[in-house]
Amino acid sequence: MLAEDNPGELWIEQGKTLFHQKRGPKSASLEQCNFGLGPGKLDGATTQLPRYFPDTDRVQDLESRLVTCMVQLQGFNHDDLVKRAISPAGSNGSDVEALALYITSRSNGMKMNVSLSHPKEQEMYKVGEYLFFRRSGQTDFACVQCHGAADKRIRLQDLIHMTSKQGVQEVVSTWPAYRGAHFVVRTMQWRLSDCFWQMRLPELKYASETSIALTTYLHYQGNGAVVKVPGFKR
């Protein structure tokens, strides 16, 4: 069951409208987009993402797959979509953010079940694991330094212990989430990008292989978590 009074629920309805609406230069909806279970089949689809897609010959997470469909089916420009995917704080949010929340909400109550059956999925997982533990950048920092033990915090913010099963499951099951400080829905791509910024690393390119690798590692580690979006974050 969703938490009461979560403003993020408004974005679910917005995303649903956008999904079924004919838009873009090709005046098409996203009803033929295949997120892994077949064209237009959304229930349970995000529980298995990231996954390998033969048509792109890539491992893709929800957001990169969504951009692929918006380009191929609707005719939107890839670079424009990527540029606008993460909305400014205090705005009404982006189409991609609303769509990502709606599609994920169709898996609410279902368990994460990410597979590593394809060699490219296995490779992506290994890269993500390496990145999670690798110290880098001007501060010589790694994800695990914030999220590798219990009872850590930055200022007043508790940090989730993501090398524990319970901790990583809490993360992967609650994004996209409504971010109270921004008054808008945020996605996993935003969460990773913001972490990179806080670690003073080079900007994380939206839907890049790096971001998908980290998501693959985290989502596989979180298998068994029950999806419950939108989450609510400070």
Where are the regions that the model predicts?
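Electron-transfer interface patches adjacent to heme c in soluble/periplasmic c-type cytochromes
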Residues: 1-9, 21-32, 39-98, 108-109, ...
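Short, charged low-complexity linear segments at domain edges
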Residues: 1-16, 109-129
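Extended cationic-aromatic binding surfaces that line active-site or macromolecule-binding grooves
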Residues: 15, 19, 36-37
